[in-house]
Amino acid sequence: MLTDIHSYLPISAQLATAGQPTAEQFGEIAQAGFTTVINLALPTSTNALPDERAVVEAQGMTYYPIPVDWEYPTLRDFQQFASALAAAADQKVFVHCALNMRVSAFVYVYRCLRGVPREAAAADLAKIWQPNETWQNFINAVLVE
């Protein structure tokens, strides 16, 4: 079940976020109708799958690796993320990192920039974590760009 994936959080019918899935869970993700996977974790992150691209593509899904350094998230990282989501606009997208912390921050910013009320986007972010100073500064910087 998708709910068994660490910090799984569906945002809409077309977008879900989570921590690192196992190889087996990528099969469940595909069976649930997801066609695109965006990975914001580093290859060295906790529980990272060394062959994740192959695992995802073997399930018939498109794979976008966008490794985001936990200590130094950048506007360029966010722009790549937004471009990947735009490329998959008509698809069901599963976005993950190690613990759904990077992802929840990126999705919060993305939703705010697309007109979702901040209170609604913040409620989903709070289900995962309260961003630390590094990440709150990143969020604030991207929102004013």
Describe the function of each predicted region.
Residues A16-A86, P117:
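Cysteine-based protein phosphatase catalytic domain of the PTP/DSP
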Residues T36, K92-F94:
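Short SAM/SAH-binding signature in class I
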Residues D77, A82-K92, L99, V109-E145:
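PTP/DSP superfamily signal
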Residues M101-A105:
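Glycine-rich nucleophile elbow surrounding the catalytic serine of serine-hydrolase chemistry
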